[in-house]
A protein has these predicted regions:
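Helix-rich terminal scaffold detector
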Residues: 1-5, 69-192, 196-202
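Flexible glycine/proline-rich
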Residues: 2-5, 21, 25-26, 157-296
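Short, glycine/charged-enriched hinge/interface segments at domain edges or termini
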Residues: 2-17, 30-122, 255-258, 270, ...
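Alpha-helical scaffold segments in soluble metabolic enzymes
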Residues: 6, 10-13, 43-46, 58-61, ...
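Structured N-terminal alpha/beta-domain signature
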Residues: 28, 32-45, 78, 143-152, ...
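Generic structural signal for buried aliphatic residues
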Residues: 43-45, 51, 142, 280, ...
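Short, conserved clusters of charged catalytic residues that mark active-site
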Residues: 54, 127, 224, 228
């Protein structure tokens, strides 16, 4: 079993910044600046910044009509499983609605990448392998979440396409975690747990930093802050536990309120229970990961 931090470093090692290209000013808006920009000897724009309207105006004011940028990564999100049914159709007790690919594709877009969604119900390992292989032509990164009954098929398909590494990560919620390089261009791929809660938390902890590194961003992870816990939460010793929460300021104090399953859509962060504790009581000082996307 490896730690969350070790697993993050392993997946970051396969997510390299994309090759830079010059883009016209309007097209460069919201992209990442790939190199420093000078006006003569004076530095005016620093590499690694997200290009905003003020940067565009500054570039134009010094006579530039293009800026050096990193393109937005193309991320293909694949969901596979015979037990998964697309929303809008009737299901029985043997099936569940396919939600992960919708959740993950929109999370990819929130992370400033280009997201493509693919859902499939493969009959054979070869069929699934062919589908994944066909997607590589438009992918800088592949993210896969399969139904519980399709994990073995996904494992075999990916292993036939390249080098895959399976890891047991000391975290909860957890599930099947693996990553690798597949296809002729050694495209990075990462698999996420089948449970939607575990898949989303794993996305924020691992996939989002991969995307930001491919964008050339300096800051890869969400901010970690201290907050006062409102309510009680529990976890398991020797693993790091993550609980969705609403993080808010009240009387100049940062508070973290864990949410119930039906309130997950309101969560804007995670409360973290470290490996040395199995429970935290109300009023405890806790570490929180804040999903502060607007300021990034």
């Amino acid at each position: 079993m490896i730690s969350v931090d070790t697993y993050l470093q392993e997946v970051l090692a396969i997510a390299h910044p994309l090759a830079p290209l010059d883009m016209p000013l309007l097209d460069a808006h919201n992209a990442t600046l790939s190199s420093d920009v000078y006006a003569g000897d004076r530095l005016v724009l620093r590499a690694g910044r997200r290009i905003r309207s003020t940067h565009i105006g500054l570039a134009a004011s010094i006579g530039l009509d293009h800026l050096p940028t990193r393109p937005h990564p193309r991320v293909v999100v694949i969901s596979a499983g015979e037990d998964l049914t697309e929303p809008g159709h009737t299901i029985d007790e043997r099936h569940s609605y396919e939600a992960n690919s919708w959740l993950l594709t929109t999370a990819v877009r929130e992370a400033e990448a280009i997201g493509y969604r693919v859902h499939t119900i493969p009959d054979t390992t070869e069929e699934l392998k062919d589908l994944i292989e066909d997607q590589l032509v438009r992918a800088d990164l592949v993210v896969i979440s399969s139904g519980p009954r399709s994990v073995a098929m996904m494992r075999e398909s990916l292993s036939a396409l390249g080098e895959m590494y399976e890891r047991e990560v000391a975290m909860e919620p957890s599930g099947h975690h693996s990553y690798g390089l597949i296809g002729p261009d050694r495209t990075p791929v990462i698999t996420l747990p089948s449970d939607s809660r575990g898949a989303y938390i794993a996305f924020e902890l691992f996939v989002r930093p991969m995307i930001r590194q491919m964008l050339g961003r300096k800051s890869l992870t969400h901010r970690t802050l201290s907050a006062t816990l409102v309510g009680e939460i529990s976890g398991s010793k020797e693993v790091r536990s993550f609980h969705e929460a609403i993080i808010s300021h009240e009387n100049e104090v940062l508070r973290a309120q864990p949410v119930l399953a039906n309130e997950r859509g309101e969560a804007n962060g995670l409360v973290v229970i470290d490996e040395q504790h199995s429970a935290l009581s109300s009023g405890s000082e806790v570490s929180v990961i804040l999903f502060d996307r607007q300021s990034e």
